[in-house]
From Swiss-Prot:
This is Aspartate carbamoyltransferase catalytic subunit. The lineage of its organism: Archaea, Methanobacteriati, Methanobacteriota, Methanomada group, Methanococci. It comes from Methanococcus maripaludis (strain C6 / ATCC BAA-1332). GO terms for biological process: 'de novo' pyrimidine nucleobase biosynthetic process; 'de novo' UMP biosynthetic process; amino acid metabolic process. Heterooligomer of catalytic and regulatory chains. InterPro entries: Asp/Orn_carbamoyltranf_P-bd (IPR006132), Asp/Orn_carbamoylTrfase (IPR006130), Asp/Orn_carbamoylTrfase_sf (IPR036901), Asp_carbamoyltransf (IPR002082), Asp_carbamoyltransf_Asp/Orn-bd (IPR006131). Keywords: Pyrimidine biosynthesis, Transferase. Catalyzes the condensation of carbamoyl phosphate and aspartate to form carbamoyl aspartate and inorganic phosphate, the committed step in the de novo pyrimidine nucleotide biosynthesis pathway.
Length: 302
C-alpha cells in the first residue's frame, strides 16, 4: 500500500490486515501507552479545512509511535495565500516529512497530492468524496463492538449526499458477505447514484425516508452538513429532520455510531445508554491511525 486515498484502492485482505494491526496498536496503548516504531520520523498534517478528531488523533497516533508532527491548520498563514498550487506545496513538504495526511475541500485533492509526493499520502477527507481512515476506524468499531462485519445489518441516517464517511464505509462493506444496508434520508440528501451503482449487486440495499431500525445491528447517524449547501435556505429545510432519542432506542440490541461532530441529530440523553458507542468509536481513531501510519511507512521503505 503506497498511499491511502480511497477505499476503492484497497481490498478486503488489506482491510483485515489493517484491522489486525489496529488491534495490536490498541494492546500497546493499553499496556504502555507508546512505542518507538516511527522514532525520528515526521508526519506532515496539512489541513485546508477545520478538523478536531481527525487531526488530533493523527497527531496523537504519530507521537504514540515515537514520531514527530509538523503542519498547518490555517491556510491564511501559508503560501496558499500567495497563489502556490497544491502540487507545489506537496512537492516541497514531501521533502520535509516521511508521511503526509491531508484534508482539503476539493474532491480529488488527495489523489493529486499522491501524484506529486515522494512519501506516502493519506486522505484525511477530500470534500464530500472520501474519508478512508474514518472508514477503517468505523470498521474497527464494528468488529470490536458488534463482533462481526460479515452478515452485518446497518442503517445510515441523515446526510447521505455529502457525507463522505458514509460513501467510503458503504464501499468497504460491499467487500464483505451478507451485508444489508438501509439508507434513510430526506429526498434532498439521498446517497449519490454513483455510490449506489458501485455497491449494488454486492450487498442488499433499501432506501427510505422513515426511520426503521428494529432489525439492525448498527445505527450510523450523520450530521446535516451546513457547509456543503450552496443555498443555506435548503439546509434549513432539512435541519433537524432526524433526531435519535431514548425512545427510538429503547432496549434494542443495537450499536449507535456517529463520525462526529454531532449537532442535534442525537439527543444528549442517548449518551448514557449502553448502546451509544460514538465516543468509543472516536477513541479507536488513535490505534487505527497508528496502524495506518506504521504500515504505510513500512511499505514505503521496502
Amino acid at each position: 500500500m503506497r498511499h491511502l486515498i480511497s477505499m476503492r484502492d484497497i481490498g478486503r485482505e488489506e482491510i483485515l490486515n489493517i484491522l489486525d494491526e489496529s488491534e495490536r496498536m490498541e494492546a500497546i496503548l493499553n499496556e504502555k501507552g507508546h512505542c518507538d516504531f516511527l522514532n525520528g520520523r515526521i508526519l506532515a498534517t496539512l489541513f485546508y479545512e477545520p478538523s478536531t478528531r481527525t487531526r488530533l488523533s493523527f497527531e496523537t497516533a504519530m507521537k504514540r509511535l515515537g514520531g514527530n508532527v509538523i503542519g498547518f491548520t490555517d491556510i491564511s498563514n501559508t503560501s496558499v495565500t500567495k497563489g502556490e498550487s497544491l502540487a507545489d506545496t506537496i512537492k516541497v513538504i514531501s521533502g520535509y516529512s516521511d508521511l503526509i495526511a491531508i484534508r482539503h475541500p476539493s474532491e480529488g485533492a488527495a489523489r493529486l497530492s499522491s501524484e506529486n509526493s515522494k512519501v506516502p499520502v493519506i486522505n484525511a477527507g477530500d470534500g464530500s468524496n472520501q474519508h478512508p481512515t474514518q472508514t477503517l476506524l468505523d470498521l474497527y468499531t464494528i468488529k470490536r463492538e458488534v463482533g462481526h462485519i460479515e452478515n452485518l445489518k446497518i442503517a445510515f441516517i441523515g446526510d447521505l449526499k455529502y457525507g463522505r464517511t458514509v460513501h467510503s464505509l458503504c464501499q468497504a462493506l460491499s467487500l464483505f458477505k451478507g451485508v444489508e444496508i438501509k439508507l434513510i434520508s430526506p429526498d434532498e440528501l439521498k446517497m449519490p447514484r454513483e455510490v449506489i451503482e458501485d455497491i449494488s449487486g454486492k450487498i442488499k440495499l433499501s432506501e427510505m425516508t422513515d426511520v426503521e431500525i428494529d432489525d439492525v445491528d448498527v445505527v450510523y447517524m450523520t450530521r446535516i452538513q451546513k457547509e456543503r449547501f450552496v443555498d443555506v435556505n435548503e439546509y434549513y429545510k432539512v435541519k433537524g429532520i432526524y433526531r435519535l432519542s431514548k425512545e427510538h432506542i429503547g432496549d434494542k440490541n443495537v450499536v449507535i455510531m456517529h463520525p462526529l461532530p454531532r449537532v442535534d441529530e442525537i439527543d444528549s440523553e442517548v449518551d448514557t445508554l449502553p448502546q451509544a458507542r460514538y465516543f468509543k468509536q472516536s477513541f479507536y481513531g488513535v490505534p487505527v491511525r497508528m496502524a495506518i501510519l506504521k504500515l504505510l511507512f513500512e511499505d514505503s521503505v521496502k
